[in-house]
C-alpha cells in the first residue's frame, strides 16, 4: 500500500480544466493526486509539466469508454490505497458547432463518452469512495439551458426526485434513437447532443447522491455536479470568458469541501453556488 493512504483522482486531465484541477489539488490536497488520461504519452507529458513546477502528481491510464481500462484503475486504487477519497469526473467531449458530422452520429458518440463513460466510472469507483469522500461530476450550464428547451413532459422526468438510474439510461438511449429516426424534435428534445448528455450527467449526480444518502448516510460523502463556466480550452474555444484556472475553481472547491461540511450534496453548483435544477 502507498505510504499516503489519501488519494484524489481526476479524469480527462492531460489538458484544459482537468489539468488545472490536478495542479490545484497537488497544491492543496493532503495526499496523492492521480492524473488520468486516455492517451498515455499525453498523460505522462502532462505529469512531467507539473513536475517541472515542483508538483508530484501520479499518472494512470484511463479511457472512460473502455470498461477494462476503468476496472484496471479500480483495481490499482483498491490495492494501493484501499479506496478513493476524491473523484473528479471531468473527461468529456463535444463536437464543434461547425462540424458537419450527421447529428445522429454526434448524439451517439457524445452520449457514449459524456454520459455512459461517466456512468461506468461511477459504477466501478463509487463503491471505493471512503467516508467523508468527495465526488465532483463536471457538467455544464448547457444542461440547465437544454433542460428548459425540452418538452414539459421530459422536464418533469428529469426534475423528478424519484427517477431511477435505469429510467435515466432509458431516456438517454431514447434521445439517441430519436435522432437516428429523425424525430428528436417531435419527441420533445432540444437540438444539442452535448446539452442532452450533460442533462444526463446532472441527473445521474442527483440519483447517485440520493443513493449515497440512503445507503451510506453516516459516511458524510458529498457528491455534486457543477458547471466550470465557459472556459478557454480546446473544447470551449479561444473566445470563452474564463481561463482554465477560473474554470477549475468550482470543481476544486467541491473536491475540497471540509470534512465536517453537511453540504452541498446532490446539487448543481455554479460559481460555488447552488443553482435551481
Swiss-Prot record:
Subcellular location: Cytoplasm
Binding site for glutathione: 95-97, 106, 193-194
Major subcellular location class: cytoplasm
One family name in Pfam for this protein: adh_short
MF terms (GO), sorted A to Z: 15-hydroxyprostaglandin dehydrogenase (NADP+) activity; 15-hydroxyprostaglandin-D dehydrogenase (NADP+) activity; carbonyl reductase (NADPH) activity; prostaglandin E2 9-reductase activity; S-nitrosoglutathione reductase (NADPH) activity
GO biological process annotation, one example: xenobiotic metabolic process
Active site per the UniProt annotation: 194 (proton acceptor)
PANTHER family, sorted: CARBONYL REDUCTASE 1-RELATED (PTHR43963), CARBONYL REDUCTASE [NADPH] 1 (PTHR43963:SF2)
Family to which the UniProt record says this protein belongs: Belongs to the short-chain dehydrogenases/reductases (SDR) family.
Annotated protein name in UniProt: Carbonyl reductase [NADPH] 1
Natural source organism: Bos taurus (Bovine)
Gene that produces this protein: CBR1
